[in-house]
C-alpha cells in the first residue's frame, strides 16, 4: 500500500512538472527568466519540471503564480468497482 501511495505522489508531481514546463514554454520563457520572476533558483524550476522537487510548497506556489496559474484542490477520485475488476 505504501508503494502505491508513493507512485500516486510521483505521478502527481510529474503531472505538475509537465504543466509547469508546458506553461513556461507556451509563454516563451526560459527557466532562468522564470526563476527570476518567481524569485527562486533556476534549480527549483528544473526540479519542479522533472517532478523531483522536494522543497517548500511556498516556492512551488511562487513559480505557479509567476506563470499566471493557480492551484485548485478537489477531492481525490477513487477507482470504481468496474475499474478495479478490470485490473
Task: List each model region and its residues.
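Short, charged recognition helix plus adjacent turn
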Residues: 1-4, 73-87
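A short, Lys/Arg-rich alpha-helix, primarily the initiator
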Residues: 2-26
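Short basic helix-loop element that most often maps to the first helix and adjoining turn
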Residues: 18-37, 62
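Recognition helix of helix-turn-helix/homeodomain-like DNA-binding domains
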Residues: 39-53
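DNA major-groove recognition helix of helix-turn-helix/homeodomain DNA-binding modules
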Residues: 58-74
Amino acid at each position: 500500500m505504501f508503494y502505491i501511495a508513493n507512485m500516486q505522489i510521483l505521478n502527481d508531481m510529474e503531472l505538475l512538472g509537465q504543466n509547469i514546463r508546458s506553461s513556461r514554454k507556451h509563454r516563451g520563457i526560459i527557466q532562468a527568466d522564470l526563476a527570476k520572476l518567481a524569485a527562486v533558483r533556476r534549480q527549483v524550476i528544473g526540479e519542479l519540471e522533472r517532478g523531483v522537487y522536494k522543497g517548500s510548497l511556498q516556492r512551488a506556489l511562487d513559480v505557479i503564480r509567476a506563470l499566471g496559474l493557480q492551484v485548485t484542490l478537489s477531492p481525490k477520485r477513487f477507482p470504481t468497482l468496474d475499474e478495479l475488476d478490470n485490473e
